[in-house]
Structure formats: C-alpha cells, structure tokens
C-alpha cells in the first residue's frame, strides 16, 4: 500500500511547493461546497457551507501536482474541484439546476453501503480497466454539487442513471476523479473500491521510480534559444509559457540547459561582424545576470563536473553557448 502524508491546509505557495515536490501521488478528498466565485457565478440560495481557504488550498495543490506530472485521484468534492481547476464547470446544486428528474444523491444509508448504480463509458478508459471491463457498478452517494461540463483535456468515464457525471479522467496525465466515496466502501471488503486505490498507488509507485531515475542521472536540455526570445533584460526565474525558465526546469526535473545566442548569418564586412559579436556577448551577459538574480536556484556551469556539483546542491545548471559561427567573426579567439 501507500503511506499517507497529511498536508496542512495552508496557502503559502513556497511551503506547498516543497511539500508537493516530495509526494509520489495526491488524493483530493471530500468536503464542503465550492465557492461559486471560482466559477465566475453568483451564489444561489441552495448553496451550502463553503470554505474559501480550502478552495484556494485545493486549487494550488492541483496545479502544483499536475505541473509535476504527479498522479492525482479526486474523491467527491476532490473530483469537482479538479474539474474547476482545469476550467470545467460544476452545478452549485443539482436539484435546482439540472432541470430534469434526479436520483437521491444524498443517501441516508450508512456510508459503506451503495445506494445507486453508475454506468461506465464504453471503450478504453481507466475505470473499465480497473473494474475488469464491467459495464455497471454500485456506488454510495453523498453530494448535492456535481461536475456539469467536463474540463478540456478530460473525458467522462461514468454516469449515474439520471445523467449526473460520476467519474472522469485526463486523456494524457495520470489524473482521475470519482463522485462517490470509495474510502467508505473499501474497508468493508468491497473489492472494486479497493482496486481504485490499488490503481492509484501503483501509479504513485511508478512515479516514485521515475523520480529515482532523475535523482540518479543528469537530465540536460541541450539547446534553447531563450536568450534570443526574451527582449532586452529578462528574468528566467519567472514562469512564462513557451520559454525555458527555472520554474519549468524545476517542475520537469531538468538539471541543466544550454542557453545559446543564435546569430543568423549576415554580411562579412568588419562592422557587421563586430555587431554580431557584440550582440552575442550582450545576450550571454544577460544569461550570466540571471545568476545574480537567482543565486539560490541556478549557477553558470562550464564543465560536466560543475553540472553534477550544482545538481547535488539542489540548483539548476545553466551552460552558455552560441549557435552558428557568425558571432565569432574572423577571430577564433572569440571562443
């Protein structure tokens, strides 16, 4: 089995980043209603107790874990908040908003007993695999909110007889959620619910093996034109899509990258060559400047051993380079 780690309900990004980086898997548990402001909606009268601190905490955890490819399992509210995090929608109250007849989704039976069926979607999906190809299973039910429109990148994998979503999975990442509470049924010997947790734990075990490989080897991005993409002064400590930077390297466990000055071939007259050399030097100096901005996160490396030493220090190694020899001009000494 897996060893549970309780994460305190805090919203300090640095603290949660450190905690999540040590995890092999994440379970998003049940709880109260989700604040509709996160859905860009006003609260309806049927909305029950919300905890905005918990919402913010859950959303941060989900983003941190998903960006690091950590396997995630959502349960009930965890299933719903996962959908919110990835820009799906949620019913504030299914009974007043679904606009059709519904089952009883808040059972009065004891939690370990199932109260209705769910139908698993046909085709290849994780739930069908976990439940050995079964088309229908029995689940318990304790909710009045539910996934409405499944988030982009996800697909629905189970539905209640009244059409309410009961499960979904990401089409690429190892992320899935269920609306019911398998943690209440598994201890009573329900083999199907045990299989859900076994599946998640196996995913976490594989992720732990992948992390161990990254700890043992040096992972290098051998070429990036980042210095040429950023105009003027830039800051690789800030996360910006489409550009290699420290946050992306940390999330992806990249130990080192070569940041190069790429100068396209131009005229060979003295003035043009000097301009190319000067521009390459300016770009590489901007890379060197990053070390003064982020001395606790990166170091400029010039040898393989320096890369290994920097990795052992928990920092990222940045190597300098040029692409195309135009910046050298006619002087090999410019190397």
Residue map of PLM features:
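Amide-donor transfer/coupling interface in amidating biosynthetic enzymes
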Residues: 2-24, 28, 51-68, 95-211
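Short glycine-rich anion-binding loops that position phosphate/pyrophosphate groups of nucleotides
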Residues: 31-34
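A short, gly/pro- and small-residue-rich
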Residues: 39-56
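A short helix->loop->beta-strand "cap" motif at the edges of active sites that frequently abuts
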Residues: 68-70, 316
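Gly/Ala-rich beta-loop-alpha elbow adjacent to hydrolase catalytic centers
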Residues: 74, 78, 83, 87
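Histidine-centered divalent metal-coordination motifs
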Residues: 76, 143, 181, 223-225
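N-terminal hydrophobic targeting/anchoring segments and the immediately downstream early-domain regions
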Residues: 209-335
């Amino acid at each position: 089995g897996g060893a549970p780690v309780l994460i305190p309900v805090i919203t300090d990004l640095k603290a949660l980043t450190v905690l999540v980086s040590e995890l092999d898997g994440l379970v998003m548990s049940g709880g109260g209603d989700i604040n509709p402001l996160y859905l860009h909606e006003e609260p309806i009268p049927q909305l029950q107790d919300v905890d905005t601190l918990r919402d913010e905490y859950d959303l941060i955890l989900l983003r941190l874990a998903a960006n690091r490819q950590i396997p995630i399992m959502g349960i009930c509210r965890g299933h719903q908040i996962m959908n919110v995090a990835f820009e799906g929608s949620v019913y504030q109250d299914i009974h007043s908003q679904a606009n059709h007849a519904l089952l009883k989704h808040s059972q009065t039976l004891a939690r370990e007993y199932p109260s209705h069926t769910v139908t698993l979607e046909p085709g290849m999906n994780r739930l069908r695999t976990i439940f050995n190809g079964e088309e229908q299973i029995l689940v318990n039910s304790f909710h009045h909110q539910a996934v409405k429109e499944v988030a982009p990148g996800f697909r629905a994998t189970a539905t209640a007889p009244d059409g309410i979503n009961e499960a979904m999975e990401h089409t690429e990442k190892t992320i899935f959620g269920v609306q019911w509470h398998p943690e209440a049924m598994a201890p009573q010997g329900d083999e199907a619910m045990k299989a859900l947790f076994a599946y998640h734990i196996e995913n976490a075990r594989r992720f732990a093996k992948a992390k161990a490989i990254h700890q043992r080897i040096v992972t290098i991005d051998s070429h990036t034109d980042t210095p040429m993409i950023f105009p003027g002064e830039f800051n690789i400590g800030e996360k910006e899509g489409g550009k290699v930077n420290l946050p992306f390297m940390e999330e992806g466990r990249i130990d080192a990258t070569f940041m190069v000055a790429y100068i396209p071939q131009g005229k060979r007259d003295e003035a043009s060559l000097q301009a190319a050399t000067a521009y390459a030097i300016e770009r590489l100096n901007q890379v060197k400047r990053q070390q003064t901005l982020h001395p606790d996160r990166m170091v400029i490396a010039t040898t393989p051993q320096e890369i290994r030493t920097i990795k052992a220090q928990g920092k990222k190694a940045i190597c300098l380079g040029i692409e195309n020899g135009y910046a050298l001009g006619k002087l090999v000494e410019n190397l």
